[in-house]
């Protein structure tokens, strides 16, 4: 099936929603994270099941225990509803979480099952289910390259 130009724009806008989510959670940017969800949206994320904006606030404290995180998203599958205002999708995710107080890297593998809604000209998540595939923790060993000359990442808006 071919897409119209408007449908292609909708698909790209939905992909941008996923990017906003990842950037918001990785930078501990509450407003950016909330901007991925409608205020009346919901999220089922492990032990948290409820309002998506409350989930965003939950993430701010939950993710503060790591030095930095990287939510890497890929394999987007998006199905647009014929009404032009609803879509469903699946997004694969591998998250790298660097522990704050130990030289340990936690890696999380999973998928997001999303329901999107378009209001006006804007797409956001209406409902998300986070599916866990696997996790691992491993000690971090130094690489052979000198990384001291690079700007070091952290959980904030600037790096």
Where are these regions (language model features)?
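Short, low-complexity N-terminal intrinsically disordered segments enriched in polar/charged residues
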Residues: 1-23, 27, 31-36
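Acidic side chains
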Residues: 10, 26-29, 43, 114, ...
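A beta-strand edge to alpha-helix "cap/lid" segment located at domain peripheries
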Residues: 64-159
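Flexible, active-site-adjacent loop/turn segments at secondary-structure boundaries
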Residues: 3-6, 46, 106
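A solvent-exposed, acidic/Ser-Thr-rich amphipathic alpha-helical stretch
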Residues: 27-95
């Amino acid at each position: 099936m071919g897409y119209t130009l408007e449908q292609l724009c909708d698909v790209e806008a939905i992909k941008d929603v996923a990017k906003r989510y990842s950037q918001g959670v990785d930078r501990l940017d509450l407003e950016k994270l909330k901007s991925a969800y409608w205020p009346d949206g919901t999220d089922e994320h492990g032990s948290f099941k409820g309002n998506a904006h409350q989930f965003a606030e939950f993430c701010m404290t939950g993710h503060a225990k790591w030095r930095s995180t990287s939510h890497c998203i890929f394999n987007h599958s998006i199905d647009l509803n014929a009404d032009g205002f609803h879509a469903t999708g699946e997004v694969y995710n591998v998250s790298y979480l660097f522990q704050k107080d130990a030289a340990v890297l936690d890696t999380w593998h999973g998928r997001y099952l999303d329901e999107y809604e378009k209001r006006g000209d804007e797409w956001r998540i209406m409902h998300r289910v986070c599916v866990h595939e696997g996790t691992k923790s491993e000690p971090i060993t130094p690489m052979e390259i000198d990384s001291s000359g690079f700007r070091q990442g952290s959980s904030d808006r600037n790096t």
